[in-house]
Amino acid sequence: MHRHHNGLKTAVLFGGIWGVLLLIGAFLASSFRSPGVLLVFVVIGLATSAYSYWNSAGLALRAMRARPVSEAEQPGMHRIVRELSTAARQPMPQLYVSPTMAPNAFATGRNPENAAVCCTEGILQLLDERELRGVLGHELMHVYNRDILTSSVAGALAGVITSIAQFGVFFGSALGGGRDGEERANPLALLLLSLMAPLAASVIQLAISRTREYDADEDGARLTGDPLALASALRKLELGTRQLPLPPERELVNSSHMMIANPFRGQGVARLFSTHPPMAERIARLEALAGYRR
């Protein structure tokens, strides 16, 4: 039930972000005498996002200073991932470990054939084997559900909207007319558009990311057959990430949406702009999936 609802919600959110893009495009096209110039910014935004998607694995792994690990180094991690990949009838991703003690894990890569799963030293020390299995099941389902593609497309659209909005506010007066008898683009409307459109696109993008987290929780729990193991891991991660957050460096911020838990401290209004749903809600859903009653 949750799975169908989340899939529908993702589709609706994509419709919303496309709606914002079409709205801002229509407004600027009606305001400027050279609407074709906007195409340049669309191409730039899409090209930048495509590059980020194609190189997402390397970017995230470098940001976390991760290194590949052999089966001799991490036999338990290899065994769990091999068993779960076999159960899912999917390719086994490459395995990495990050030296940071901040407890977290993430998956990245273009597709199941070119994927990587990374655990930090902190999470390997924090969780027991059952909980680690739950986390790895979650990460594998991000790969197998192609959530990296989903988040990249959402990011691409948000980037295009931001580029067009910036174009409008900085060059609107130049392209909006100005000769006698010609109507000039409304500078106040352009300013509001440049502020509100990227904000709306970002909020929708983050909502898509949160929805995909719910699906990875549920699908990963079904893959392992142990929803309560992932729920237990999330409880530990909620406390662990608060005690040992990652520094808010740009490279880490750009990769944070891939991680199983929000790696930064964030309270109050900051929660609205979190790439992750509330831990309490994720845990409650997993307990409901297991038929757990308080």
Swiss-Prot record:
Source organism phylogeny: Bacteria, Bacillati, Actinomycetota, Actinomycetes, Kineosporiales
Parts of the chain that traverse the membrane: 12-32, 34-54, 152-172, 188-208
Source organism of this protein record: Kineococcus radiotolerans (strain ATCC BAA-149 / DSM 14245 / SRS30216)
Cofactor dependence: Zn(2+)
Gene3D superfamilies: Metalloproteases ('zincins'), catalytic domain (3.30.2010.10)
Residue sites binding Zn(2+) per the record: H138, H142, E213
Record-given protein name: Protease HtpX homolog
GO cellular component: plasma membrane
HAMAP family, A to Z: Pept_M48_protease_HtpX
Uppermost EC category: hydrolase
PROSITE patterns referenced in this protein's UniProt entry, alphabetically: ZINC_PROTEASE (PS00142)
Membrane topology reported for the UniProt record: Multi-pass membrane protein
Subcellular location: Cell membrane
Pfam families named in the record: Peptidase_M48 (PF01435)
NCBIfam families reported in the protein's UniProt record: PRK03072.1
Domain of life, source organism: Bacteria
Major localisation: membrane
